[in-house]
Regions:
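Non-globular, low-confidence helical/coil segments that flank catalytic cores
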Residues: 2-3, 7, 16-277
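Activation on beta-sandwich/Ig-like modules and their edge loops
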Residues: 272-373
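Repetitive helical segments and hydrophobic/amphipathic motifs
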Residues: 11-12
Length: 373
């Protein structure tokens, strides 16, 4: 495994695995234009948002690199797919989660259709002023202060993590209106680490926020190929003028920040990707909702931790420990497929959209597309 770290502030020799005593770590996983933020210290290991469904392999790998096998909590800042899409992966992979937290403000669906409830879990709704505690670590809920009926981004949970080593401000996709309300509230936004709102887009992170935070490290999670113009040059300039070093996940496995006794240091996370051995082709029969995986090579292929993803419906199916023999096929059906016509059941209906163009992709365990149809 290769990891590259370019630390800004040295605080001694740091172990590259595990969590050293007396520090907090933040990993902004490189999930494209989305958020999946792992935070770990002696008190807890939590996940803030889950990225898009198709990036599940990238989240899986980051959790493995961090040694995370269970989560004390998942905080879902808001319901947009680039933050909530990976919930299905967490559920299907069987990763233990002690508690689920969410913003009570959203308008896209009724509460019974909230993404956390869609995976069979019950969220605890966090109002501004609430605090979630793990030992000496607190997650203070600063926003939303009111419900937006026009922009889900402005319904984002905004959290301040406060621990013995310092403060991290976690802002979801907060845009200008929520940002202004937060500034007007008089909340103390000073922090060592800022997770920059809304992927560094130009609709957030004004000078007021940059100066109020005055963070040592500002982290932007985005991919300009998915969201051109991010990070916005003006956003980066305002952060730098406020004294922040800006780190962007694009092109890397992620960004790691370590916080120790008020000093923050950042570096890029990069690791050698495992090879996917085999030549697997995907074919889809949309009418019967059957997806056929065919091994066209001359060696058996393991499908462990591979997954299928339907783009239009944002649906994900994690394959099991199936081995696909050379020249063999595996047929995946859904609850809409005729009984007895498939080998493995994707336990959902209407996975493939018949209302708009859909693409189903087979992804390998690292989150790389293998075959699409």
């Amino acid at each position: 495994m290769k990891k590259v770290f370019c630390f800004l502030l040295a605080f001694g020799a740091l172990l590259m695995t595990g969590c050293a005593r007396g520090e907090a770590r933040l990993w902004a996983v490189g999930v494209g234009k989305g958020d999946a933020i792992l935070i770990q210290n002696e008190d807890c290991t939590v996940l803030i948002d889950t990225g898009k469904g198709y990036a599940a392999g990238k989240l899986r790998r980051a959790m493995a690199e961090m040694g995370v096998e269970k989560l004390d909590a998942v905080f879902l800042t808001h319901v947009d797919n680039d933050h909530a899409g990976g919930l299905t992966y967490l559920a299907q992979a069987g990763i233990p989660v002690d508690a689920w937290y969410a913003s009570p403000c959203f308008f896209k669906f009724k509460k019974k259709k909230h993404p956390i409830r869609q995976i069979g879990q019950e969220p605890q709704w966090l109002e501004a002023g609430a605090t979630v505690r793990f030992g000496e670590t607190e997650f203070q809920v600063l926003a939303p202060l009111s419900k937006s009926e026009t922009e889900e981004n402005d319904n984002s949970l905004v959290l301040m993590m406060v621990c013995p080593d310092g403060r991290m401000l976690l802002t979801g996709d907060m845009e200008g209106p929520e940002e202004e309300a937060l500034l007007q509230s008089g909340a103390d936004l000073a922090c060592q680490v800022l997770k920059v709102p809304n992927h560094g887009d130009d609709d957030a992170t004004g000078a007021g926020l940059a100066n109020a935070a005055e963070a040592q490290i500002a982290v932007i999670s985005t991919d300009s190929s998915e969201k051109p113009g991010t990070p916005d040059a003006g956003v980066v300039a305002r952060l730098e003028q406020a004294g922040s070093q800006v780190w962007v996940t694009e092109g890397h496995g992620g960004v790691e920040v370590r916080l120790n006794q008020g000093a923050a240091a950042a570096g890029y996370l990069d690791w050698a990707l495992s090879e996917f051995y085999g030549d697997v082709r995907l074919a889809v029969d949309a009418e019967t909702e059957r997806m056929t995986l065919e091994n066209t090579g001359d060696k058996d292929v393991s499908l462990k931790d591979c997954y299928l993803y339907s783009e239009a419906g944002n649906e994900l199916f994690l394959l099991g420990d199936e081995a696909l023999p050379a020249g063999g096929q595996l047929v995946v059906g859904t609850k809409s497929s005729p009984e007895g016509t498939y080998d493995v059941l994707w336990n959902e209906k209407n996975v493939i959209s018949n209302k708009k163009q859909d693409t189903v992709t087979l992804y390998d365990p690292e989150g790389r597309g293998v075959s699409a149809y």
